[in-house]
Swiss-Prot record:
It comes from the Eukaryota. The chain crosses the membrane at residues 665-685. It comes from Arabidopsis thaliana. Residues 1-664 are cytoplasmic. The keyword ATP-binding does not apply. The gene is GC1. Keywords: Coiled coil, Golgi apparatus, Membrane, Signal-anchor, Transmembrane, Transmembrane helix. This is Golgin candidate 1. InterPro entries: Golgin_subfamily_A_member_5.
Length: 707
């Protein structure tokens, strides 16, 4: 099928090239041809009649083609009415030749056929010109085919060769009109008309090798639908699973056969009317060829679809055959399993029959034993009633004792709670008193410290004054010595000078005053030193008293605080033990009540069962009292262990607080350590968060690239 389609496409390309060359030759010859006036007048009536017939034929074929080509996608046909051009002619002018122009574009496969029919004018003033009929057929995959002699076989099909490299088709449409004189006879006009008809009959000929096969190849192109139908009949039948597929195939085959039959009939009609409408025949044949090429493309598409469906159905049949083989294997395996199961069932049935026989014998033995146990039942019933009464009495006594013990434990717990509250209040009062005393001691210490500071300031002032007085005393002694030296010098000099004597006396008076001031300053200095020593002694005594008082108060407060904490822990442990004992007693009481109810229910059930049946049941046996659960046994030891752990934690916390309170460097070190740990954790969390975000972004990008 593919080789046939390739051959048809090669044929269409050859026709296109030859048609273009013929059109160019005819356009060159049209300008050179001139016919006599007598020939023009004689053939005017015949050409007008042939023009009318051709127009009627074109209208009917247009209707038929429009109805037949609606199913083909991308096909548009348009007929352009013949246009008239005014041509100035005289009696000696002649009519132009008939032109058949066909343009086939290889890219778009568009077929355009232009048919121009010039008409002769009756006189010199008429403006009638050549009639041009143009038809455009637009399709992406269509081609055209023509038959040489107009006979299209409908019954036989000849397969074309895979390729036609040497075939060429030359389309020659020309009308050779003989020149005649102005006074020609009717016989010459008849001869010219006959020659025109003969020239129109020879439309297509193949000058190259294989002339006889051209008609056969064109006939093969026309009968594409018939060949496809025959190939469909020759293909092996494939089981179709869907009825819709069959209906679609039948519908497509019917529509294609109907369209091809209509086009064939139209082509036959056109070829039969070749003599009367020569030029119309070429146009119709071109249209038929275009329609057949479009149908050929449609049939190619349908054939491809059918081949795809055929391959799909073959795959389905293969899968169905494989599944059938698999099911047959499963069936054989199931049959073998059924035989095995049947044999095993027969064996099991035989074993069950033997078991039934043994059970029947055992039932007989049990019936005999039941008859013997009926005698024992009456004696056991009396024993059971007495045991139940004793059990009820014991349970009531135990319940009463547990209630009394629970009440005593509750009273003890209340007393301990009240005593604990009282001790707690006393401890709080003592703590407040100690706090007041500590505040008073701190205020007294501050006051003593302030007095000591004031006295130290006074001592410093006195020391400064003493230093000043000592410096003044030394200066006065120096002046006194200077005066004595001067006095001695003056005595050695002239003793009779009165002024010098007066001056010496004045100097002596000054020396006396200076000595007196020195003595006074020394006395004041001694007094101040005595007072300073006294203040120093008082300060030392006050410091000793303050240190002794603060140390004693601190030790007393620590001792009292330790005693209170120990007492508080002891009371708390007592409360916990009392609460655990109370919970254990309540749980045991609830358990005993529950067991009592269960025993009563069992007694009622046993009584009902004794009345209903006379057989012995194992459920009516006496049940022993269950001991307390294991975790209740370990409650006492667990409470003591918990108390020891709490005491250990509390003592460790107290020691740590004392150590930190006494050593400020340790407090600072602990503070810096906590800050460092906090900052390190923040940095670590931030770093891990950044890494997690980077991993999430990388995973998202990988997922996007994968998608």
């Amino acid at each position: 099928m593919a080789s046939w389609l390739k051959a048809a496409e090669d044929l269409f390309e050859v026709v296109d090239r030859r048609a273009k060359s013929v059109v160019e030759d005819l356009s060159e010859e049209q300008n050179d041809l001139q016919l006599p006036a007598s020939g023009r007048k004689g053939s005017q009536g015949k050409r007008t009649s042939s023009k009318k017939k051709k127009l009627v034929k074109e209208e009917s074929s247009n209707k038929r083609d429009s109805s037949g080509d609606q199913s083909g996608p991308g096909v548009s046909q348009s007929e352009v009415p013949p246009s008239k051009s005014s041509v100035s002619t005289d009696e000696t002018s002649s009519s132009g030749p008939v032109l058949l122009t066909r343009e086939i574009h290889p890219t778009d496969a568009d077929v355009q056929s232009v048919l121009s029919l010039p008409l002769s004018v009756a006189d010199t003033k008429s403006d009638d010109a050549a009639v041009v009929a143009q038809e455009s057929i637009v399709d992406g995959d269509r081609s055209e085919s023509k038959h040489a002699d107009g006979d299209i076989p409908n019954d036989s099909l000849v397969q074309p060769s895979p390729s036609l490299p040497d075939k060429e088709i030359e389309v020659v449409v020309s009308e050779n009109l003989m020149d005649a004189p102005k006074n020609g006879t009717q016989r010459e006009l008849d001869d010219s008309s006959k020659r025109d008809v003969e020239n129109l009959d020879s439309v297509v000929h193949a000058p190259s090798v294989n002339e006889g096969n051209v008609a056969q190849s064109t006939g093969d192109e026309v009968k594409v639908g018939t060949s496809i139908n025959l190939e469909k009949e020759q293909e092996p039948k494939v089981p179709v699973t869907s009825t819709n597929l069959k209906r679609e195939q039948d519908r497509r085959a019917d529509t294609t056969s109907m369209k091809i039959q209509d086009q064939l009939e139209e082509a036959q009609g056109l070829l039969k009317a070749t003599v009367s409408t020569g030029q119309s025949k070429e146009a119709r044949l071109a249209r038929v060829c275009a329609g057949l090429s479009s149908r050929l493309q449609e049939i190619k598409a349908e054939n491809a679809q059918l081949e795809e469906l055929l391959t799909a159905e073959q795959e389905l049949t293969k899968s169905y055959e494989a599944s059938i083989r698999h099911l047959q294997k499963d069936l054989s395996a199931a049959k073998s399993e059924v035989t095995k199961v049947e044999s095993s069932m027969v064996e099991a049935l035989a074993a069950k029959n033997s078991e039934i026989e043994t059970l029947v014998s055992a039932m007989d033995a049990l019936k005999n034993q039941a008859a013997l146990n009926e005698g024992k039942l009456s004696s056991l019933q009396g024993d059971m009633e007495s045991i139940m009464r004793n059990r009820e009495l014991a349970e009531t006594r135990m319940m009463q004792a547990l209630r009394e013990e629970l009440a005593t434990t509750e009273r003890r717990a209340e007393e301990e709670r009240s005593a604990h509250n009282a001790t707690k209040m006393a401890a709080m009062e003592r703590e407040r008193e100690l706090e007041h005393r500590a505040v008073d001691a701190s205020t007294a210490l501050v006051r003593i410290q302030r007095i000591a500071d004031e006295r130290t300031a006074k001592v410093a002032d006195f020391e400064q004054k003493v230093a000043l007085l000592e410096a003044e005393c030394t200066s006065l002694n120096q002046e006194l010595q200077d005066m004595e030296v001067r006095a001695r010098r003056g005595q050695k000099k002239a003793p009779d000078e009165a002024n010098q004597v007066i001056q010496i006396q004045a100097w002596q008076d000054e020396v006396d005053r200076a000595r007196q001031g020195q003595r006074d300053a020394e006395e004041k200095l001694s007094l101040m030193e005595a007072e300073m020593q006294k203040l120093r002694v008082e300060m030392a005594a006050m410091k000793r008293d303050a240190e002794h008082y603060s140390r004693q108060e601190h030790t007393e407060l620590e001792k009292r605080y330790r005693e209170l904490t120990d007492l508080l822990y002891y009371k708390q442990t007592q409360l916990e033990t009392m609460a655990s004992e109370k919970a254990a007693a309540e749980f045991q009481l609830e358990k005993e009540v529950k067991r009592l109810h269960e025993a009563q229910v069992e007694v009622e059930k046993s009584r009902v069962s004794r009345r209903a049946s006379a057989t012995w049941e194992e459920d009516s046996e006496i049940k022993t009292l269950e001991p307390l659960p294991l975790y209740h046994r370990h409650m006492a030891t667990a409470s003591t262990q918990l108390q020891n752990a709490v005491k250990l934690l509390d003592s460790g916390a107290v020691r740590a607080t004392r150590f930190l309170w006494r050593y400020p460097i340790a407090r600072m070190f602990l503070l810096f350590y906590l800050v460092f740990v906090h900052l390190f954790l923040m940095y670590l969390i931030h770093r891990l968060q950044e890494q997690a975000e980077a991993q999430e972004v990388a995973a998202m990008t990988n997922n996007v690239f994968r998608l």
